[in-house]
Amino acid sequence: MPTLVVGTPPTCLGDTPQPCHKNSQRQGPFSHGAPGRAADWKAVAKPRLCAPAAEDDVAALRWPGPSQQPDPPWAAPHVVGSDDLKEPGPWGKACSLPMWSTGPEARDGDSSVSSGRLSCSSGGHDVCVSWKERPPQVLGPQQRPRKSDARLEQLRDKIRAQAWQQGSCASLGTSAPSSASRLHKASTLMLRRKGQEAKNPPPAPECSGFSILSAAERRVEAKASHGQGRELSRVSQHQVPVLREKPKRVKSSSCKREKTPKLPSPRRAAKDKHKDEDSELVGVYAWRKGQALVRSLLGPPPVLRRHHSKDPSRDPALTVDLGDSEKVIAAKCSPVCAQLPDATSAYSDQQVSGNTPSLASFDQPATIQTAMAILQDLRQQIQAGLELAQARKGGQELGPSKRRLQDVAGRGCCRDPNAQSSFSKSPWAMTERKHSSLERARSVHTWEPWSSSTARESCPQRAWGAQGQDRSFQRPESPHERLGHFSQRPWSALAGQACSPQRAWGAQRQGPSSQRPGSPPEKRSPFPQQPWSAVATQPCPRRAWTACETWEDPGPRLRNPLERPSPPAQRPWSSSGVQRAGPQGKGRGIGSPVSAAKHALPRPTGSFPQNPLGKEKDTLRPCPRSRGLLGPSHSSESLREFMRQKAQARRRQALEEKASALRTRELRSRRLQEVYRQQREAVLGRAVPVVSRTTPGIVTFVPSSAQSGGLEASGSLESPVLEWSKVTSGMVLGGQEAPGSFCLCLNRAWNHAETLDPPGMGGPQDGRDAPVLLSASPSLGSLELQDLTTRYLPRGMCIYLDPKEAEHLGTSSSLHLRHKQAQLQALETTAKVLKQRVDSLTAKLQGAEALDTVRDPAVGLLRSCPHSLPAAPTLATPTLATPACPGALGPNWGRGAPGEWVSMQPQPLLPPTYFLDGETLSWGPSWEQQQSVSPRAHCESKPRGFPEEGHVDVKPDKRLQRGVAPFQALSPSAGSSYAGPATLHPIWGSLGLEETPSVGGADSVAPCTPRSCGKGDPADRPWAGWSGGRGIHREHLPLPSTRAWPYGVEKSFSTWRASTPRY
């Protein structure tokens, strides 16, 4: 903002003001925060700002209070308090006193001395200060640098404050942030600012310690801490009555500026830059000069311990604070100051904040005397502690005592709440009172955060590595332990060893973030956080190293039993320095006490930090520890290998599970297949004897060949052709033929539609396994055909069994006897069939009409549905096709044993021709009776021979001659007749059975009674007379007719034709 240059004051109150150079315009309370008012100020108040250039006139602007003694030229000028001024009157009217505004910082709430942003013109321009009705004689031309009493007095007051704070040289440095230090810093900034307002200082003071670099650094730091100083300045206004400012005035002006915040114009920015540089020069010089003086007089400050985890300013990066730049400049004046800037400033911050009200009222000599006394007391205390330690342990004992004393001093300053909150009392003396004795110091030392770790000499590297040192401050060549310890020691016994090699690597330890642009790292960084050093005056590196060594060796007795062992991260320093007695050990051991003292000086983090917020963030950003503490680090290769192994294991497990599942499935499948196979074998290959031992009177008809397409009911004219498959002798057990067993096998057509396969016996040898239709007749009476059909009857097999015969034969009957009976029955049956044919032919010949009556339907039947009765195969090759179960079906075959059948030669069977209903063969008077008694007594008119020729052979003799042997072989077992009258031969009887539903079309064999086995009455064996035997009764063989089937038996007959053997 444009301001007025101090010029020649107007001679009268109403004179028009003369405009001054706008580059040198001063920012006033009307111009800083309110650009609109700046124009008014420029237009109206300019003439009031011009004053004669008299060097003595500046004295009128100095502080009315503390002292009127001239100060050294490097002292900062006083700032006029707001209470010394009166309210401004209307323009054109003079007011009693000038009023100095706080400048732009007042708007921000920072009225304390900061980086000198209030107004000292640079570049030869006169100082333009904001005022209200200022007397003209107060201001004079400021064309040349002046060293007025106001500046000296201001500087003297500031030095008094600093000396009262034991010469702290790190009030603006990296000391622990605390409310006291903040207040003190705010007050010092305010003092410095007002001093700069009072007088325009020289652009570049000639005193030592000043430099453009320091001014620039100071300005940057002031800007960085500008946000912090806003609230602090307000607090300092109330807490520093020495300044005699009216807080309301400051706040009102601040409010005025805050109400209309606008961006500063370029001219104002340039002016602010100049003023900042000038004010920074003054403030920096005052601070540095006081710092150097205090340190030169008082020596090293005591240690303020702090916890690493709670102290943001412990990190090496935090050393880059407001005090770093000044610390480097002060190092030029005092080598001790270069080494001990941070902790000293921290200590002075805490004390000055508590003592600021009374510091300004004292003269500089008194302040210096007080500071000298305090430092002397501290020096004596430290010396006594060192001597006591040396007396106890010699070279090794020196370290523990020194460490205890340092611990005592640091704790007296920081551990004590009173000392920490207010340092108006001598903290060193208080520390001396509290911890004057070595034992007491030891007891205090035991509960220090680093005492437990120091006692752990077995793990030196853990303590170093566990330090929360910032990796950003670690150079590659410097180990973590060395960097962490050296960067984090608040005050070290090596403070005086600026020439030691540790100083070099301490500078290396300082990360780029911890080094200011223009500050020499070797001077600033070696001991960045050593606020106090018990050995600050020790020029000998070896002596400092001895102190460090002894610090490193506290011994187990220093640990408090009640103390909880601090984790490695909390162990600031350990016995690593003691174990490394060599030069390298020194280098590393030196850092140990520093870290220990760093833990010993817990800088309060609750209050504002000394570092600017931005800088603190920058320095705290790289703070995260290395990942070593988080657990064992794994390389990407190891992780990939681990994942590969896991994937392979999963794949293997999946493959194993799949293979196991496959094996289980295969095993189950095999088991199921085996079960199914066994079931099939049980069903298909059941070992069921065709001829049972207990019932040897079974006759089995095994189908050899049949018309598979013509399986119809027996009542149909197209009944399937029935053929003899084989006739065997011997008993069949299971799937094999037992020697001497008897089976009569022929093709059957069952009346029922169910088809049964012959299980296991292989069926007929000709390979044609025709299905069989079962037809049963209710006229069978005692025949148990259905039982066998439902239980054991295989397909293509018909078993006729007379239960009585079975019971009679049983196991008591000899097999040979049964065979004979079967043979006899077969012979009788054959004879009967032949006799019936002969009789039929004879009757046919005798009666032409009767013959015609009988022949025509027979021929039609043969032509329409030819049937053949195959010749029985040779008995030399007996093979039963299918097994059957006993005791179910069976006509009343005789008991004749089929054993003799083997010797019989089969011949083509000449089956008789059956006639349909209505056709009757005149065989004799008993035909009708036989027919009425047993409908199975199917008779044929005459044997017709082979029906496949389509004609009936009328040569009965020839037919009889050819058919005797087969019928003998086909005679059923002896005594196989049932209770009912059954006198037909087996073949004709079987044809008759075909019509009976109970028998299931048992038209293949006619049952025979036991008396038909060569023993009974010839009447029971109508064919006996044919074979030259016993009582042939032709009247017992009726021809099939309507009258021959009184029981509703189906009247369709099958014509058997003898076929040649197929074996």
Curated annotation (Swiss-Prot):
Biased composition (Polar residues): 163-181
Record's compositionally biased regions (Low complexity): 111-124, 508-517
Region: Disordered, residue numbers: 1-41, 62-184, 219-278, 300-319, 392-484, 496-539, 551-658, 1010-1030
Coiled-coil portions: 816-851
InterPro entries xrefs: CEP350/CC187
Residue ranges with Basic and acidic residues bias: 146-160, 219-233, 431-442, 472-484
Protein name: Coiled-coil domain-containing protein 187
Originating species: Homo sapiens
Species lineage: Eukaryota, Metazoa, Chordata, Craniata, Vertebrata
Protein's gene: CCDC187
